[in-house]
Amino acid sequence: MDTEDTSSASSSSVSPPSSPGGGHHHRLPPKRRAGRKKFRETRHPVYRGVRARAGGSRWVCEVREPQAQARIWLGTYPTPEMAARAHDVAAIALRGERGAELNFPDSPSTLPRARTASPEDIRLAAAQAAELYRRPPPPLALPEDPQEGTSGGGATATSGRPAAVFVDEDAIFDMPGLIDDMARGMMLTPPAIGRSLDDWAAIDDDDDHYHMDYKLWMD
């Protein structure tokens, strides 16, 4: 009886050997590096170290330190050109002008230089370089009609054109009085004729003398 129990227990404890091809092995998918896909989708197609943010309305820049995994954040800029200039300043500060891969290789001499290779000095020089290439704002469009605006009382606002000035010529030249003087003068006998009325009356009316009717000048 004991022999049977011992044999049954030993047989149950021994598991049958598994065949080489019968086992199931679950393979884990390869680990993906976090953030690389987003980096590829947002980086600028031309400029180094420049990525888009906020749907492409803003551009950020960062550079990797040599012999290190750390990155230096250089800021956010309104245009990719400004971010690219900031990258060039940082690249020159970290790798030197000859060893740096620049976005604008023809203009390193026009960029400000960082005092040291510390992240603070690099960020300061990068911001200064970006400001040198900030685009000026577009000019404001002037309204076609400058009288569109109205004042608080509802009256039309005056434009920059000078207002028409009324000149009273009658008041300046005293036209009413001048006309009265002319009228009175027409009713008087001219001085030259008044002195020689007797002589004119004595002149005979013939072909050799000119006859003048001076009754027009008499009252």
Swiss-Prot record:
Coiled coil among keywords: no
UniProt keyword annotation of Transferase present: no
Annotation: DNA-binding region: 46-105
GO molecular function, one term: DNA-binding transcription factor activity
Biased composition (Basic residues): 23-41
InterPro entries noted in UniProt: AP2/ERF_dom, AP2/ERF_dom_sf, DNA-bd_dom_sf, DRE1A-I
GO annotation, cellular component aspect: nucleus
Main location: nucleus
Location(s) in or outside the cell: Nucleus
Tissue-by-tissue expression: Mostly expressed in developing seeds and apices.
Annotated Low complexity bias: 7-16
Swiss-Prot/TrEMBL induction comment: By calcium ion, methyl-jasmonate (MeJA), cold, drought, and high salinity stress.
SMART domains: AP2
Alphabetical UniProt keywords: Activator, DNA-binding, Nucleus, Stress response, Transcription, Transcription regulation
Region Disordered, annotated ranges: 1-45, 134-161
Cysteine disulfide partners in this protein: none
Family, per entry: Belongs to the AP2/ERF transcription factor family. ERF subfamily.
Known role: Transcriptional activator that binds specifically to the DNA sequence 5'-[AG]CCGAC-3'. Binding to the C-repeat/DRE element mediates high salinity- and dehydration-inducible transcription.
Protein name according to UniProt: Dehydration-responsive element-binding protein 1F
